[in-house]
Amino acid sequence: MPKIIDEFFTGPLLPPLLSWSGEPEDWRLTPDGLVVAPAAGTDFWQRTHYGFRVDRGPCLMTPVSGDFTIEAEVSFRPVHQYDQAGLMVRLSPDCWLKTSVEYEPDGPSRLGVVVTNNGWSDWSTQDFKGDGISLKVSRVAGDYSVHALLSGDWTQLRICHLAEDDGVRPVTAGLYACSPQGAGFQATFRRLCILT
């Protein structure tokens, strides 16, 4: 697969293929990578269990057509419950997936995948201890597989389908970070790679 993006975020500018949706007030390029500090009240979730709908947060995305794989390496300094950073693939506010580590202050954090179809989200999780992770999402014929690099091996987290994805039209894919409960969280994205 050829690479359309292979970025370590150490240069003075973001790659031209990437653009912000919900650009945060606080982001910067550093020798360690892209640092993002999302505002309080940012999140992506639709209805299920909690009853609310929220669709706002910083995403650094690019349109991608056909089959692809997107990988990212991210480290985090969480402050509040549910602080999160990872990958997102999006067709609309009612149809998307995200994978990340969500912080739990009183126990292990949650490594998981949220899949949203027809305006309803679901969340699969497993315990995670650590302050950084590599994540990967692959699209093949409109279906998705999600993996995390755990103990040196890519471990499957989820296989899913996005209802609005016909396997042909472009989706947007990239990085995201959110702070549902309060400000102060910082995520550092050390690498983003997209292969088609």
Positions of PLM-derived features:
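Extracellular glycan-recognition regions
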Residues: M1-T196
